Amino acid sequence: MKLTMSAIIMLGLLLGSAHQSAAQDATQTLYKMKCQICHGPDATGSAAGKKLAVKDFTSPEVQKQTDAELLEVAKKGKNKMPAYDGKLTDNQLTELVKYMRDLAKAGPKGK
């Protein structure tokens, strides 16, 4: 009985980990498809994004914004950033904000 319970717990942990990894992979793919062209691979802004005055997502100025403020920009757009309300789900946008925050925590590549 003890072995069976341990096996069930381990299976649950493995399945949960696989689900989380798949969700993270989906968000990373979505970032690459929708965001990276302007925000760059590390959220500091690509060459094209910098020409459009994209803000460095790793900067204190951007990081002090709340998730709700960042979601509002993602939904409605701002300046040259397109609006994604109706194009992406609220969950996708929320996960993208989390992903970009993780990129910001990791810091710019090469620094």
Language-model segments: which ranges?
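Compositionally biased, intrinsically disordered low-complexity segments
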Residues: 11-12, 40, 65
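Periplasmic/extracellular electron-transfer cofactor-ligation site
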Residues: 28-53, 78-82, 102-111
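Extracytoplasmic electron-transfer domains, predominantly the class I c-type cytochrome c fold
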Residues: 52-105
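Short hydrophobic/aromatic-rich motifs at helix boundaries and adjacent loops
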Residues: 6-7, 41-43, 69
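Generic structural signal for beta-strand residues in well-ordered domains
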Residues: 6, 14-16, 28, 50, ...
